[in-house]
Structures are given as C-alpha cells and as structure tokens.
Amino acid sequence: DECASAWAQGGIAAVLDPQDSVDAHVNDTMIAGAGINNLQAVREILSQAPAAIAWLLEQGVEFDRLEDGQTLHLTREGGHSHRRIAHVKDRTGLAVHQALLHACRARANIRMHESHAAVDLLHAHASSANTCFGAWVREPDGRVTPWLAGHTVLATGGLGQLFSRSTNPWTATGDGIAMAARAGCAVQDMEFVQFHPTALQINGQAAGLITEALRGEGAWLKLPNGERFMPRHDERAELAPRDIVSRAIHAEMQR
C-alpha cells in the first residue's frame, strides 16, 4: 500500500450531477492546466469518467452515498466549479487500490508476482521502430532474469522522490520512466511533479496528507498568527488548483 494511489484521499472527479456538465469539467481542467493540456485527451478522459465510476462500483468500491442509499455523495475540491468528487470517506485511493487488487487476485487469467521488480526493458532497435518484448526482472533471490511478453505496459508511478522534500511516497522513484527513456521512448512534461499542498507532520513522523476535500467543504488555510492568506494569492482562495495553493504556501513560508 506504499504507493500514491493508496495515499490518495479526496476522491475521483466525474460528472454525475444533472446540474453539472462535461463541458464545465473540461473547462475547469483546462484552466487548472494553464491551457497547455491536450484538449482532445482531456475531453475523452472526462467523458468516460462516469462510466469509470460505474465500473469501479462493479469491482466493489463502496463510494459514499446519500441517505437514500442510492445517490453518490459528491464533494468538491480545488479547481472544480461543481461538486463532482465521488469518494470513500477520506481514503478513496486505498479503497480503490484494495478493490482492484482483490479483483485481480480473483481472476484466473491474471498472475501476480509480488517481491519482484522490473529493472529494464527487453528491446531491439530496428530500422523502422524500437521493439519491446518484455523486461529484465529481479527475482526475490536477487537473480535478474528475462521475462518475455507480447505486450508490455509500464504503470509504475512518478518520480517525486527526486526531491529532498516530497509529499509522494518513498516508492515514487521514477523507475518506469527511466526504463522507458533508456529504451528510446520519448518522455514529455517531466517538469510537472505534483506536491500536495497540505500535510501534517507530528513529532518527526512521516507527514500524512490532509485531504483537499476539507478545503472543498469550506476549510481555510491560515498562518501561525491566525491570518488567512489564500485570498491575496488567487480569487478562488482555498479552492484554487493545487499548484497555485502549493506556491502560495511556499511564498508565505519565505516571507
């Protein structure tokens, strides 16, 4: 469970309220991305979000519901103009992570190899294109062996641990990105590393994330003297996107 997915708290954004729209969701996302997002990709992903929530429900994710027991409870997070965040209390990522692990283990056609680590891709440089046919894998006994595959998918998370201070888990070391780059794949937008704006550290322990949904429900960010500071950094105040909130917090700490 030491991965960013399991750490995620707030929820998953999808247009599930009749008063909301995919166009509004797309607009919010493009603004939060400073307009450099791929509009086609944004629209395609967000259009499929409601179906993705329905599929997660089928896999056993128990999203919070209203008192009627049917309607999903939706909260709001930074950068969103509507309530569209489906959630499982304040541990949505862990709930999704565990439900999908359970679903994978229940399928006879999926084999899971724990305590193994891919260390590099098996690939051949051809005149027309690079060809990947698997990966070098470190076995539990330390041996590195070739695993052949007709199709190889890299889904290994980010590289937040490149920074000395990070709200990413210790596993976010960029191994998959490095393997892809060494194999000749193009990497893009590597400068965009997310720092969660709010965390709590007690007595030197590892900092725990404070869910963004708190700000979505009206919580304010204040300085040690009790002064609220976000309104002077952005008109959306605590509901500004994460990058703006993170920079504002850093700026206040440097004053």
Model feature map: region roles:
Residues 13-45:
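Glycine-rich active-site loop/strand segments that organize a redox cofactor
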Residues 179, 185-255:
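An anion/pyrophosphate-binding glycine-rich loop and adjacent beta-alpha core
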Residues 1-12, 18-19:
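Glycine-rich FAD pyrophosphate-binding loop
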Residues 146-157, 180, 226:
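Short hydrophobic core segments
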Residues 5, 22, 38-53, 89-97, ...:
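Generic structural signal for well-ordered, non-membrane alpha-helical segments
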Residues 154-168:
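Flavin (primarily FAD) binding-site architecture
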Residues 32-73:
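Rossmann-like flavin
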Residues 57-143, 155, 199-201:
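Conserved redox-cofactor binding core of oxidoreductases
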